Amino acid sequence: MGSPRRIVTTLAAFLLVPTIVSAQATRQDVTPEQRARMQVEREARIVAELVSRRPIEALNSIWIEELTWMEVRDLLQAGTNTAIISTGGIEQNGPYVATGKHNYVLEGTCEGVALKLGNALCAPIIKLVPEGDIDEPSGHMRYSGTISLRQETFEAVLEDVASSLEAHGFEHIVFIGDSGGNQRGMENVARTLNERWHKAHAHFIPEYYQYG
């Protein structure tokens, strides 16, 4: 059973479909001048919306995906300056443990770290990571159910997610990974971002995985 907020969001999406279809049909009859004016008006509405007050009580969650954009904005303005990007994986974990083990672990540990810090939010867990070669399966890819990303794909995803968070005003982007194959990519991306950024900082935390 989903949360009440998710149920309402899903229903709203279904109700919007007829409106979207109607708007698409109307746009076909609009002149270039009218389209330009509509674009200016649309931009003005967006600018006003970006500074508008949140109309509902804030949800008590540290997961960005569970918050509205206004809730994230207000938390940033109130001093929440850290975002945690956690990486898990879908891989074989023996005959008794689910392939999503690392992702399930991170649901608890990322939240615990964020709550301990007190000024942090958790980005959506990166659930797909390098697990071995795909074309000629190696590593975990030799086991059914494993899903792998190429190393360059993984690093590109990390870089884009971190850059998105930095663009919104997060000053500290923290990388933690629950699997050994994730560590090199996070370290590489953190180094690249720190060379590029002037104010924000990327932090790769190897101790999260290598705690022994």
Predicted regions and their residues:
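Bacterial N-terminal signal peptides that target proteins for export
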Residues: 1-11
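Active-site histidine-anchored catalytic micro-motif
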Residues: 27-37, 43-45, 54, 63-65, ...
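Glycine-rich loop at the start of a catalytic domain that most often binds anionic cofactors/ligands
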Residues: 96-103, 135-138
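Active-site machinery of serine-nucleophile hydrolases
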Residues: 111-130
